[in-house]
A protein has these predicted regions:
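ALDH superfamily catalytic-core signature
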Residues: 26, 32-154
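Short hydrophobic/charged patches on amphipathic alpha-helices used for structural packing
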Residues: 15-16, 72
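Short, surface-exposed connector motifs at secondary-structure boundaries
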Residues: 1, 19-26
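Glycine-rich NAD(P)-binding loop of Rossmann-like domains
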Residues: 16, 22, 126-128
Length: 154
């Protein structure tokens, strides 16, 4: 069984071709629910096999028996790998109440220690967001969370 990963600037044209071409027997997408709906609809004419991994709703859970330092290290990777622009990044954290203060303090310290910049520069630990749209999406998520009672740790 083979796998092909296609990249290009006209994703709509690529998607339409893959979904309508008889040579392609199955489509797999890891991506947004919006794009998943489009591809599923386009594949339905041929009753093409489709598997979809959608939404990126990955919680990071810390129980009270966890090694806090290891949990913080894991949270940093899970939240900030590739500037938090992958489908496997955690989008929320659940921490048991009796360890919340210690965990959140250490997580805030680790986050403050990050250096954002060009990945080729010394000391840089994470790159910038990919574009203005990505920045605006992050800002919207922050505003939404705060409006629902979340606190920003600094």
């Amino acid at each position: 069984m083979g796998c092909n990963i296609l990249m290009g600037t006209d994703s709509s044209a690529i998607g339409k071709e893959l979904c309508s071409n008889d040579v392609v027997r199955k489509i797999h997408l890891t991506g947004s629910t919006e794009v998943g709906r489009i591809l599923m609809r386009q594949c339905s004419d041929q009753i093409k096999k489709v598997s979809l991994e959608l939404g990126g709703n990955a919680p990071f859970i810390v129980f009270d028996d966890a090694d806090i330092d290891e949990a913080v290290a894991g949270a940093m990777i899970s939240n900030y790998i590739n500037a938090d622009q992958t489908c496997v990044c955690a989008n929320r954290m659940y921490v048991q109440e009796n360890i919340y203060e210690e965990f959140s303090k250490k997580l805030a310290e680790a986050t403050r220690a990050m250096k954002v910049g060009n990945g080729f520069d010394d000391g840089v630990t994470t790159g910038p967001l990919i574009d203005q749209q990505a920045l605006e999406k992050v800002e919207e998520h922050i505003e939404d969370a705060v409006s629902k009672g979340a606190s920003i740790l600094s």
